[in-house]
UniProtKB/Swiss-Prot annotation:
NCBIfam families: gatB, PRK05477.1-1, PRK05477.1-2, PRK05477.1-4. Gene3D superfamilies: 1.10.10.410, GatB domain, N-terminal subdomain. This is Aspartyl/glutamyl-tRNA(Asn/Gln) amidotransferase subunit B. GO terms for molecular function: asparaginyl-tRNA synthase (glutamine-hydrolyzing) activity; ATP binding; glutaminyl-tRNA synthase (glutamine-hydrolyzing) activity. Belongs to the GatB/GatE family. GatB subfamily. Heterotrimer of A, B and C subunits.
């Protein structure tokens, strides 16, 4: 029997606010254990949560980016469960009135297949702390993460392959990233994903029994976990067995999912309205204010790059892969620089440097101003492309002006024939055999002489001018 795969994803996104959702403690990643905490995070008796308005702002922006309806009157709920990293013994979340509902997002697979994935809801909640089990037999609780604001985005079970799930995550990350409400970095925990997977015979409308898969810390691991889980369930069903509703953990070393616990239902959490957080009324004016603050989406930017700037689809996708690079590009072309040249540098030398240094664009000295200044120096013949690579490294490491560095370092390209001719004659004198070979009909000998000329000028000779002069002198020598 053949089965159809049914996948739904629950994605937690950490919001980039300066303080937590209900306390003034910092949300900064890292730091010593329990250093970014407040009495509210510790749940000391008598303390009350105070809502961070910036979290509501971020929730509205996310809902708009995901084409969702917005609950204009909403409240928070208590989700009750006991665990050491949850000192209140309940989590403040949203149950029946999430901030966003009834949304959708477009996905595209590598083969060009497109689909619309519906999004059931997006609700705001606080994160829990973190447990660490030491080798000394003790367990330790770090509450730095306790109270960090999250938005949980729950898709409908519209995905039919692990590849579609991967494409959905890619599109979702891009949409959230361009709102500016989160950096969506899975490696730092600011984006986490749980998957619900079930199988059903083709043609059957009812869903099969689902399992939830956790502990997937990258998009590729999500795909690997889904591949394994689909195969595991299919094997059980074909053998006449039954699937249990359970929660499983992905082991990235073995590529397998492992049983964690029998799945709880929503009733186990005993949701009820949070009495200490008031109901919020979201006006149309508030929503429009957030809509107007949203930057151009990645999709709109790609269309602009292709239709208005003449870039290829590949270039447009590379530039919009991260908002930081796209923003940098948009600023750079304001200086009347050829968009294609800026694109080439960002995808070439800049990307290679960032990868090798394991840094992001804002962490180096390169700016839209000094990059475009350097490109102009290449275009007007002041420096060669080879010298430009040296200039770029200087700008990346230390910032500053490209033009000032070129002058200070003596890197200005030699284009004056009166300066080049004596050097050419000196090269001929030191390489008489190559000159004789060229005059004897060996054309490649001239290339060797050009190489010697560039070496003699430490790469500063204008290649076009130097090569033209050298051939003229060879023919007249």
């Amino acid at each position: 029997m053949n089965f159809e795969t049914v996948i739904g994803l629950e994605v937690h996104v950490e919001l980039s606010t300066n303080s937590k959702i209900f306390s003034p403690a910092s949300t900064k990643f890292g730091g010593d254990p329990n250093s970014n905490t407040n009495v509210i995070d510790w749940s000391l008796p008598g303390v009350l949560p105070v809502m961070n308005k910036g979290v509501i702002d971020s929730g509205i922006k996310a809902a708009l980016a995901l084409n969702m309806d917005i609950h204009k009157s909403m409240h928070f709920d208590r989700k009750n469960y006991f665990y050491p990293d949850n000192p209140k013994a309940y989590q403040i979340s949203q149950f029946d009135e999430p901030i966003g509902y009834n949304g959708s997002i477009e996905i595209e697979l590598e083969d060009g297949h497109k689909a619309t994935i519906r999004i059931e809801r997006a609700h705001l909640e606080e994160d829990a702390g973190k447990n660490t089990h030491g080798t000394d037999g003790y367990s330790y609780v770090d509450l730095n993460r306790q109270g960090v604001p999250l938005i949980e985005i729950v898709s409908e079970a519209d995905m039919r392959t692990p590849e579609e799930a991967y494409a959905y995550l890619t599109a979702l990350k891009e949409a959230i990233l361009y709102t500016g409400i989160s950096d969506v970095k899975m490696e730092e925990g600011s984006m986490r994903c749980d998957a619900n997977v079930s199988l059903r015979p083709y043609g059957q409308e009812a869903f099969g029994v689902k399992t939830e898969v956790k502990n997937m810390n990258s998009f590729s691991n999500v795909k690997k976990a889904l591949d394994f889980e689909v195969a595991r369930q299919a094997k059980i069903l074909r053998a006449g067995g039954e699937i249990r509703q359970e929660t499983r953990r992905f082991n990235d070393k073995t590529g397998e999912t492992i049983l964690m616990r029998v799945k709880e239902g929503a009733s186990d959490y005993r949701y009820f309205p949070e009495p200490d957080v008031p109901r919020f009324e979201i006006s149309d004016e508030w929503i429009e204010q957030m809509r107007e603050s949203l930057p151009m989406t990645a999709t709109a930017r790609r269309a602009h790059y292709i239709n208005d700037l003449g870039l290829s689809d590949y270039d447009a996708r590379q530039l919009t892969a991260t908002k930081e690079v796209s923003d940098f590009f948009d600023q750079a072309i304001k200086f009347d620089t050829d968009p294609k040249l800026v694109s080439n540098w960002l995808q070439g030398e800049v990307a290679q440097y960032l990868n090798s240094e394991k840094k992001e664009l804002h962490e180096i000295g390169l700016t839209p101003e000094n990059l475009t200044e350097m490109i102009r120096l290449i275009s007007d013949g002041t420096i060669s492309s080879k010298i430009a690579k040296k200039v770029f490294i200087e700008l990346a490491k230390n910032g500053g002006s490209a033009e000032e560095f070129v002058k200070k370092a003596g890197l200005v390209q030699i284009s004056d024939p009166d300066l080049l001719l004596p050097i050419i004659h000196e090269v001929f004198a030191k390489n008489e055999q190559s000159v004789a070979d060229y005059r004897g009909g060996k054309q490649n000998a001239a290339k060797a002489l050009v190489g010697q000329l560039m070496k003699a000028t430490k790469g500063q000779a204008n290649p076009t001018v130097a090569q033209k002069l050298l051939y003229q002198e060879l023919d007249n020598f």
